Amino acid sequence: MLATVYLDGKKLKRIRTLKGKTQRALSTESSVSTSTIWLLETREKNERFHPPTLTKLARALEVEPTDLVGGE
């Protein structure tokens, strides 16, 4: 059986705040809209996300994409 991989909203928010970035700053640096970042952070498990979005956010936060995901 395959594991379900999801973008973890809690991890995203925790890393963003630890890096001292606002949602707006992360949006500017990643080219991901503020509303998308807000939606991702307010949902604990985001099973429907675009891999390029994950990559953009990880680069802007200077972390590996795997740091932003969870799985079951």
Give, region by region, the residue ranges found by the protein language model.
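Short C-terminal boundary/hinge segments that cap the last helix of small helical domains
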Residues: 62-72
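The alpha-helix within a helix-turn-helix
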Residues: 16, 27, 58
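Residues within the helices of the helix-turn-helix
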Residues: 13, 24, 55
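Short alpha-helical DNA-recognition segment
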Residues: 20-40, 44
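Short, basic-rich loop-to-helix N-cap that marks the start of a DNA-contacting helix
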Residues: 44-59
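Key DNA-contacting residues within the recognition helix of helix-turn-helix
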Residues: 13, 38-39, 69
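A short, Lys/Arg-rich alpha-helix, primarily the initiator
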Residues: 1-18
